[in-house]
């Protein structure tokens, strides 16, 4: 169950709070969502998987919630979207028999290395697989959720730990050992809180001050991160610091976004099909 469905706080926005916040945004509606702040060029470049994990980590404790059973599949969905955005994979063109996003296979476009171990490992699996598989099947295979013993070789192991090590190398996390009564656990507390706050502010702005009410006008990576953060059940961490009025608006706008029909949105001009295919897979699971 995701944040949007198990959240106990009031999530219905009153007309007065909606009107109040929208009036604050009038001067920002015409701003292009792709326009970055001047300092953005100096920001650390993170993959979608690193961003999702960073949003899900408890800052001081250095681990994700034990009750979060969504983030594993969310990270695998992020891998597929990241590969598509880097021009390595794509969905096969629609045909009369295969029009739906979830019916179309994931095809290899380029096997050139990305420099990221997880991405390159996934790329090797996709290249070596015959027959080709759908987005939903790939998420299941990469997560290890398959009854076919011959398909277990495609499971990506220790994904969170490997992503966390990347974030340690980028100076955002550190590594510690914590004792939990019967066992020791490696944790990764956040050391660069500025980077995490920047990431959270980016998502908050995308559904508040920079809201454009049209996914086709949103920055592709921001749209992908919203979809993945929702599917990974980490949006609560992003919006919890907002005032009640802004929290309600942010959650409801995100809810409206992820409840759009992926089949319709995926066919629009310049749409990134993989984002909508991943969302469709999560909606079905």
UniProtKB/Swiss-Prot annotation:
Location(s), subcellular: Golgi apparatus, Golgi stack membrane; Golgi apparatus, trans-Golgi network membrane
Basic and acidic residues: bias regions: 10-43
GO CC list: cytosol; Golgi apparatus; Golgi cisterna; Golgi cisterna membrane; trans-Golgi network
Any one of the GO BP annotations: Golgi organization
GO MF entries: cargo adaptor activity; phosphatidylinositol-4-phosphate binding
Tissues showing expression: Expressed in a subset of tissues tested with higher expression in salivary gland, small intestine and skin (at protein level).
Modification Phosphoserine occurs at: 112
Keywords: Golgi apparatus, Lipid-binding, Membrane, Phosphoprotein
Beta-hairpin required for oligomerization as annotated region, ranges: 176-187
Binding sites annotated in the UniProt record for a 1,2-diacyl-sn-glycero-3-phospho-(1D-myo-inositol 4-phosphate): 67, 76, 157, 160
InterPro entries found in the cross-reference section: GPP34-like, GPP34-like_sf
Function: Phosphatidylinositol-4-phosphate-binding protein that may antagonize the action of GOLPH3 which is required for the process of vesicle budding at the Golgi and anterograde transport to the plasma membrane.
Family to which the UniProt record says this protein belongs: Belongs to the GOLPH3/VPS74 family.
Protein name: Golgi phosphoprotein 3-like
Protein's organism: Mus musculus (Mouse)
Source taxonomy: Eukaryota, Metazoa, Chordata, Craniata, Vertebrata
